[in-house]
Curated annotation (Swiss-Prot):
This is Protein VAC14 homolog. Keywords: Acetylation, Endoplasmic reticulum, Endosome, Membrane, Microsome, Phosphoprotein, Repeat. Transmembrane segments: none annotated. One of its GO terms (molecular function) is identical protein binding. Scaffold protein component of the PI(3,5)P2 regulatory complex which regulates both the synthesis and turnover of phosphatidylinositol 3,5-bisphosphate (PtdIns(3,5)P2). Pentamerizes into a star-shaped structure and nucleates the assembly of the complex. The pentamer binds a single copy each of PIKFYVE and FIG4 and coordinates both PIKfyve kinase activity and FIG4 phosphatase activity, being required to maintain normal levels of phosphatidylinositol 3-phosphate (PtdIns(3)P) and phosphatidylinositol 5-phosphate (PtdIns(5)P). GO terms for biological process: phosphatidylinositol biosynthetic process; regulation of postsynaptic neurotransmitter receptor internalization.
């Protein structure tokens, strides 16, 4: 520093002392400056006051010499003390050089800067609030200072500033929020602690409504919640808890829509604390905001559904996620199925962008788990649609929801509980919004069929419920069963389309007397037949599924849908099946279900007597397909008490190729005759006179069997049949003889028998072609 330079009104002694390396001498100089400035204040000499401050600032505080800078800092503090209440007029000039020293490399100098600013702020009190942002900015840097003394000094200044803000009603929150939003993304734990402490203070001040600006800082708060420091995480939990308490207290003023996507992101993070907290917030948002959250359903489901499959290690997250899922599902109502009103161009332009609710920070999406479904939605969170205003009607966007559900159902790595939840959602949507959901049915259908192969019975049951709802919903009824379900869907018609003309031929085979095979129950729609076709195609391509789950699936469908329609339609389809071996296997499966399942009790009773035209039509329809398997055809005749026709069929067995499989099925039929299902048949053996063809049919089966356990069983049963002469009483002899049950006049049994012969001939030809025997149709017994 140039000693010859004029520093007036500062005296040479003051200048010399300010430059001294000893603190005590600089302190003496500060007292002299304080006295000098007081005199200027008394004289109202603002020019000299400004000159003193400028000199201390430019020549000392911003000097290249460290001791001069220290002197300048203590001098500026002395000026502030001398100015007292008038210091507010000069705060900019007093504060700026001190804040510059906050960046000094010398830790002692940074400490003196803290001390000087503390004295300046202490005198000015509320007058410093217009300069709050620069003070906060400087303090946020010192909070992370490596020197403990500097940090201690900054904490004293920080507490003073908090007291001033707390007692003042003039704090500029609007001007402060941008700085807070920027600083909240700091990764330094001390800076984070500083930020959190300030938010806690601001939340506690009644006159400051920080809740209005929560969307600006919520993302940053959740990132701080993942800090490694236990104390910081605890502080952040307290802050978030206070905010949530305020939200519950006054939900009408909360900007739920602007924070929804932020929660969606943090509900997917790998940090358990962040995920649990975000999920708890999401639960409260859904319950408090209600349908305002519906436009964000796809994002919420993306976050919530995977959590439902968590194990006990994350039980808390799983439980909260389940509540979120259930609450969100309840928000969907039938009114969401109403047609969407077309939007004008002006409305589309004024709609907010969902990305606007996210802070524009690089770290926004950090920590989010990249799920297997992310690729379906592009980048970021842009797929979710934001609610425009609270007054505007809330629209449920099914496209995004269905895409998320389809994605999770397609993912084979996803947990069982998640898959069940997805299926529950689909079922719920088909119940509440069937018209809109049927636009997506063609895209959902393949994955729903594929889900039938799931390892979990519970998943398969829910899947069948969805498929049954699709097949029975009135919304699925279309004039053209092959028409696409939506204008913009890519549909694989080879799987679902059933041409109208082809279907008519399929349902009404030529030369069929009194036969109508088209399911006509009003609860069935055009998708019912598509479902049956695709289900049989699935069984055909996945024989293991048919073997392991076929009976289970069909029995459940008989409970969920009309059993008669299921058997009717499957018989129709199998009638045209080109794979004869599969047709035979499928008929055997259906027959076993028909004869043994409790779910088919009513259908068995309907077929038992063939009293109605409908039951006769059903019998004819089943019979034509049952012809793919000779033994099942006989069992169907036993069930329907067509004993004469059963006997005629057994007579035809002499012309068939008797194989081990054939004899095994005869064996099983004999075992079945001993079951409760055929109790009525066994009782009819007491009336041999009126049931001669029953006896002949059973003896025919006996003659087909080799000397096996089944042979012994049936033989013993027939030996128990009493002599009809011994059973006749005097009343019976006097009474007119009863005629046996006659064949129904509406059924052409001759034509049915011809059909049986035709089908069996086709089977024989196919078997011989496979074995390389060509047209050599000699009968061969394989034992």
């Amino acid at each position: 520093m140039n000693p010859e330079k004029d520093f007036a009104p500062l005296t040479p002694n003051i200048v010399r002392a300010l430059n001294d390396k000893l603190y005590e001498k600089r302190k003496v100089a500060a007292l002299e400056i304080e006295k000098l400035v007081r005199d200027f204040v008394a004289q109202n000499n603002t020019v000299q006051i400004k000159h003193v401050i400028q000199t201390l600032s430019q020549e000392f505080a911003l000097s290249q010499h460290p001791h001069s800078r220290k002197g300048g800092l203590i001098g500026l503090a002395a000026c502030s003390i001398a100015l007292g209440k008038d210091s507010g007029l000069y705060l900019k000039e007093l504060i700026e050089p001190v804040l510059t020293c906050f960046n000094d490399a010398d830790s002692r100098l940074r400490y003196y800067a803290c001390e000087a600013l503390y004295n300046i702020v202490k005198v000015a009190r509320g007058a410093v609030l217009p300069h709050f942002n620069v003070l906060f900015d400087g303090l946020s840097k010192l909070a992370a200072d490596p020197d403990p003394n500097v940090k201690s000094g900054s904490e004293l200044l920080d507490r003073l500033l908090k007291d001033i803000v707390t007692e003042s009603s003039k704090f500029d929150l609007v001007g402060f929020i941008p700085l807070l939003r920027e600083r909240i993304y700091s990764n330094n734990q001390y800076a984070r602690q500083f930020i959190i402490s300030w938010i806690l203070v601001l939340v506690s001040v009644p006159d400051i409504n920080l809740l209005d600006y929560l969307p600006e800082i919520l993302d940053g708060l959740f990132q701080i919640l993942g800090d490694n420091g236990k104390e910081i995480r605890k502080m952040c939990e307290v802050v978030l808890g206070e905010f949530l308490k305020e939200i519950k207290k006054n939900p009408s003023s909360v900007k739920f829509a602007e924070m929804a996507n932020i929660l969606v992101i943090h509900c997917q993070t790998t940090d358990d604390l962040i995920q649990l907290t975000a999920m708890c917030w999401m639960r409260e948002f859904i319950q408090l905001a209600g349908r305002v959250m519906l436009p964000y359903s796809s994002g919420i489901l993306t976050a919530v559904l995977p959590c439902l499959a968590y194990d006990d290690r994350k039980k808390s997250i799983k439980e909260v996620a389940n509540v979120c899922n259930q609450s969100l599902m309840k928000l969907v109502t039938p009114e969401d199925d109403e047609p969407d009103e077309p939007k004008s161009v002006a409305q589309k332009q004024t709609e907010p962008n969902p990305e606007d609710s996210l802070p524009k920070q690089e770290g926004t999406a950090s920590g989010g788990a990249s799920g297997p479904c992310d690729s379906s939605f592009g980048s970021g969170i842009s797929v979710f649609t934001s609610a425009s205003t609270d007054r505007a009607p809330v629209t449920l966007h099914l496209d995004g929801i269905v895409q998320v559900l389809n994605c999770h159902l397609s993912d084979t790595t996803i947990g069982m509980m998640t898959r069940i939840a997805v299926l529950k959602w689909l079922y719920h949507l088909y119940i509440k919004t069937p018209r809109k959901m049927f636009r997506h049915t063609d895209s959902l259908f393949p994955i729903l069929l594929q889900t039938l192969s799931d390892e979990s019975d519970e998943v398969v049951l829910k899947d069948l419920e969805v498929l049954a709802e699709i097949a029975s919903s009135p919304a699925g009824q279309t004039d053209d069963p092959g028409a696409p379900d939506g204008p913009d869907l890519q549909v694989n018609h080879s799987e679902l389309q059933v041409p109208t003309s082809g279907r008519a031929n399929l349902l009404n085979p030529p030369n069929t007397k009194g036969l109508e095979c088209s399911p006509s129950t009003p609860t069935m729609n055009s998708y019912f037949y598509k479902f049956m076709i695709n289900l049989l195609q699935t069984f055909s391509s996945e024989r293991k599924l048919l073997e392991a789950r076929g009976p289970f699936i069909i029995r459940q469908l008989c409970l969920l849908l009309n059993a008669e329609n299921i058997f009717h339609s499957m018989a129709d389809i199998l009638l045209r099946e080109e794979d004869l071996k599969f047709a035979s296997t499928m008929v055997h499966t259906l027959n076993t279900i028909l004869l043994t399942s409790t779910e088919l009790f009513q259908l068995r009773n309907q077929l038992k007597d063939l009293k109605t035209l409908e039951s006769q039509n059903l019998f004819c329809c089943l019979y034509r397909s049952w012809c793919h398997n000779p033994v099942t055809t006989v069992s169907l005749c036993f069930l329907t008490q067509n004993y004469r026709h059963a006997y005629d069929l057994i007579q035809k067995f002499g012309d068939l190729e008797v194989t081990v499989d054939f004899l095994t099925e005869v064996d099983k039929l004999v075992q079945l005759i001993e079951c409760p299902i055929f109790t009525y048949l066994r009782l009819q053996l007491l009336d041999v006179k009126n049931n001669p063809y029953l006896m002949k049919a059973l003896y025919g089966l006996l003659m087909l069997l080799p000397q096996s356990s089944a042979f012994q069983l049936l033989s013993h049963r027939l030996q128990c049949v009493p002599n009809p002469e011994l059973l006749q009483t005097e009343d019976c002899l006097k009474a007119a003889p009863k005629s046996q049950k006659g064949d129904s006049p509406s059924i052409d049994y001759t034509e049915l028998l011809q059909h049986f012969e035709k089908v069996q001939k086709q089977h024989l030809e196919v078997r011989h072609q496979r074995s390389g025997r060509g047209d050599h149709l000699d009968r061969r017994v394989v034992l």
